[in-house]
Amino acid sequence: MRAVYDDIKKTRNVPDVNSFWKYLARDPVTLKRTWESVKEVMARGALDPLTKEMVYVAVSVTNGCAYCIASHTAAARKAGMTDAMFGELMAVVGMANETNRLANGYRVPIDEFLAT
């Protein structure tokens, strides 16, 4: 567990691990597996860190995870997200949720040209 905590602190450049990881430590196997997965997925790749954090915020809002919203909004702000970017992100999340529900409610069939 200590090695995982040390890796989290080093990777995230923070003095201590946040509550999420402390709660996961109740099951060291889950802690290690989850950290390794998060570390791999959130590493720099085709998407830059800010984009990944903003996607995480959007999914967290949709899933209603207050802890994840707070954590990843802070990380996105640290990576450069401005108030204007956050506002647009919330507008997109809200619109996507609304139009998704309408499409599902009306049972709109997928257009042939979209089914690729």
Go through the PLM ranges and name each one.
Residues M1-T116:
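Hydrophobic alpha-helical segments
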